[in-house]
Each structure stands twice: as C-alpha cells, then as structure tokens.
Amino acid sequence: MKTLTTDVAIIGAGPVGLFQIFELGLQGLSTVVIDSLPEIGGQCSELYPDKPIYDIPALPNAKASEVIDNLWQQAAIFDPTFLLAERVEHIEKVSEHSFIVTTHKQTQIHCRAVVIAAGNGAFSPVKLKLPLIDKFEDTQLFYRISNIEHFRDKNVVVLGGGDSALDWSLTLQKTAKSVLLIHRSSNFKAAKSSVNKMYELCEQLKMQFLCGQVSSFQEKENKLTGLTITSKDGVNRRVELDELVVLFGMSPKLGPIDNWQLEMHQHQIKVDTQSFQTSVTGIYAVGDINYYPGKRKLILSGFHEAALAAFSIAETVLEKDRIPTLYTTTSPVVHQRLGVEHSLEAMLS
C-alpha cells in the first residue's frame, strides 16, 4: 500500500482542479491530485483538446489544450503530486481536520482537507458492445490514443461520429497505411469543418467513410483481423484491419461520490458559497460538481470558487480566524512562494 501525506487532497485534474493547486500554493499549502483519467486536463484534454474556448479572461481565443498547458505551467511552481489513472473510492474523516483518501489502487493520502473538483464525475469511455471483443483491448482495440506512432503504416478502423472520431481520423490518415471511419449514419455530432475535410479526403482517396454498425468481428491466431459492418438496409460488409479505435465518447459517472454522505442536489454537491465547503466540514467542492442557487457551469466560475475555497481551507489548516488577502503584485511572501524576486524600488521605477 502506497501512503502519501499532504495538506490538501484534490480530486480532479481538470482546469478548476489545476487552478485549485495554484490558489492553495499561494497560501503555502501542499497538494496531492487524484484523477481517474491518465492525463491532466479533464474534459478539455479528453474530449475537445483542439476546440477553441472564448470565455477565459485574458485569453480571447485559445484551444482547450492551450488553456490546460497554461494552467499546468502556473500550478507546476508548487510541485503538486499527481495520482493519474486512479479513482478515489473512499474518504474517511479521522478527526475534525484529518482525512484519509483511498483510491481503487489502495493508495492512501493523509490530508487535512479535501477538495472535490471532479467536474461531472469520473469519466470512462463508452465501449463497443460486442461479446468477447474486450480481449483485444490495449493491444489492437483502443478507446483513446496516447501514442500515435503505434498506428503508423497500419490499417486503422475508427468508430464514432463525434469530434474525437473525426479529429483523430483526420490526424491518423497522415501516417497510417489506411483509415476507415465508420459511423451509424451520415449525421455527425462534430464540427462542420471537420466533416467537410473528411469528405474531401475521401474524394482524394486518402481515407474512407462507411455508414453502418459493427455486428461481429473476425480473428485469426488470437489477433483481431476484421469487422462485419451491417448497413441500415441489412447488407453486411467485411472490412479488414490491423488496429481498431473506438471513439463513442466518454460517460461521466459520479461513482463513489454518491456514497460519501454529502448533501446532494440532482447529482451535484451542495456547497456554502462563502467557503465552498460541503455538508461535511473539511470537504470542499468546486467547479461543475457543485451546486448552489444561481450556479453556472463555467470554467471561470470554477476559478472564482477555487480562490475562495483556498482562503477558507488555509484558515482551517493554518488555524487562523482570517487569512489576509496577499496580492501577487506586491506581497514578498507570495513572491517567495512563487519563486520570484521583486523589490518595491523596482516596481516603482
């Protein structure tokens, strides 16, 4: 069993979770961050990394991946510990200001406060419902792409009709031997520009598109070799492949959060807007996972919540009645924590 000790455990490494690291770091508090996904960024990284976001202050037009990169650059100063591809199963309140957070890998984090920044909950891929197909998972069947070189010079079949399926098909066709995109219809839930580009590449014979659904698979010597695709009119067609990428989207699930004895409102965690503390003292919730009257599910709202939560947590952990507001432009204490040096004379010159 792996054991870690920190001031605050943050559940969720999406944009709000990353900003929570920074805000707690400004207060001099250490963090361990747990996320069920294998990389930081939450939905921004997993679902729409190349899509533009227009409502982040001072970033009028930035890709989701760029927002995450900037947030990480800001948070990395405080050297957080990450536990990725780990799902929190249990939170035990040992005493008023002491918790043990346990993951499904039996990692234990001893901390003095917990922040739930889990977005819509833990994400898991929507899987291909075909008996016995799962035996090829992570060898020839993939629900996410982490190493594009694995597909170089291979015959790749991509299933799906959303942004991820279109974007990866367009990317893979540059290096794969062949790419065949399969979707149940010609109605896509993806950017029109991506759909148009896909059809353009099909006309240029650089990739293919086929309407239909997978009805069975073929294998030889324990290797996946092909799929049978059934069209709407019942016609079967067999396609050969080396690799299969299934991008049906991600399914958010609250999972164990439902069992943590927190007061809920329609699958969201109720919080006090003064501190963003939940119904359990010492456990906080920020971002899309929380609820209060007037709640808006916006990244910038989550940033505001993370800042206020950090002050409240610091007052609890440091046992102070009220933490003063220290400005990053002028506070020597904050400058020391940020690892920057500024003198009053330099700022006034």
Swiss-Prot record:
Keywords: FAD, Flavoprotein, NADP, Oxidoreductase. InterPro entries: FAD/NAD-bd_sf (IPR036188), FAD/NAD-binding_dom (IPR023753), Fd--NADP_Rdtase_type_2 (IPR022890), Ferredoxin-NADP_redctase_2 (IPR050097). Binds 1 FAD per subunit. It is an enzyme of class 1 (oxidoreductase). Its EC number is 1.18.1.2. It catalyses: 2 reduced [2Fe-2S]-[ferredoxin] + NADP(+) + H(+) = 2 oxidized [2Fe-2S]-[ferredoxin] + NADPH. Homodimer. PANTHER family: THIOREDOXIN REDUCTASE 1-RELATED-RELATED. This is Ferredoxin--NADP reductase. It comes from Colwellia psychrerythraea (strain 34H / ATCC BAA-681) (Vibrio psychroerythus).
